[in-house]
């Protein structure tokens, strides 16, 4: 159990919103190497893991997550944002973020409602949260657009939300992006089990896609010889569905 938790903790520590998956793919490549299992990157940057040249079964999950992107720099130096995937903004409000610039620099910040103080804005509680009325406040002394531009922040830079990973004493894991890093961790644990038990040459491949949250995760790159596909992803919990936090859903 500790191995799979460690793998999940490592996956969660590497930001990977759709379009920014190279580091987490490299981590998986290194992990596969410890079990003498080969890897192949797809043209889209996903990863096929397996030694068999003609796999019949593909086990697939995704390592990309929800996120955001800088869509503009406001006159006060705050950042406008566009969503990557479908984050529900009220659940992300107040979250700390890392802005990753194209030059490799990183800056911290917070996602906030415009005019967020309830003492000033009497409509703050009632306001529908959307990208048009929210912003990223940088942890940097900026007061105008030019100040932010001097930091090297540009439109198109990635905004990564903190995962807040926690493994509780009662055996629960709480974190953002368990969709689908929990699934990926389970796949990697199974991959290592096969590799270390001498079964690494079975006609099985693991496929880690990297654009699922924007709608085209496993649409390309699957081995052409695959006859069956097993997809590992989150199980939905909510009204009128059969899932719960302690069960595996098969559909």
Residue ranges and their predicted role:
Residues 1-251:
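N-terminal hydrophobic/helix-forming segments and targeting peptides
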């Amino acid at each position: 159990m500790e191995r799979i938790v460690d793998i999940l903790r490592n996956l969660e520590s590497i930001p990977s919103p759709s379009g920014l998956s190279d580091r987490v793919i490299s981590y998986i490549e290194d992990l596969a190497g410890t079990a003498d299992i080969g890897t192949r990157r797809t043209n889209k940057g996903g990863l096929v893991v397996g030694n068999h040249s003609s796999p019949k079964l593909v086990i697939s999950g995704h390592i990309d997550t929800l996120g955001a992107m800088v869509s503009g720099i406001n006159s006060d130096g705050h950042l406008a944002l566009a969503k990557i995937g479908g984050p529900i903004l009220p659940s992300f409000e107040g979250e700390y973020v890392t802005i990753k610039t194209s030059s490799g620099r990183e800056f911290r910040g917070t996602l906030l409602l415009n005019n967020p103080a309830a003492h000033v804005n009497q409509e703050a509680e009632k306001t529908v949260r959307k990208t048009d009325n929210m912003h990223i406040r940088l942890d940097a002394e900026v007061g105008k657009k030019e100040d932010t531009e001097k930091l090297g922040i540009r439109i198109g830079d990635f905004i990564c939300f903190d995962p807040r990973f926690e493994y509780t004493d009662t055996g629960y894991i709480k974190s953002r992006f368990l969709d689908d890093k929990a699934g990926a961790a389970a796949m990697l644990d199974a991959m290592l089990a096969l590799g270390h038990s001498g079964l690494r040459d079975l006609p099985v491949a693991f496929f880690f896609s990297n654009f699922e949250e924007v709608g085209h995760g496993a649409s390309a790159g699957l081995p052409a010889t695959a006859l069956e596909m097993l997809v590992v992803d989150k199980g939905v919990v909510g009204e009128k569905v059969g899932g719960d936090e302690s069960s595996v859903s098969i559909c």
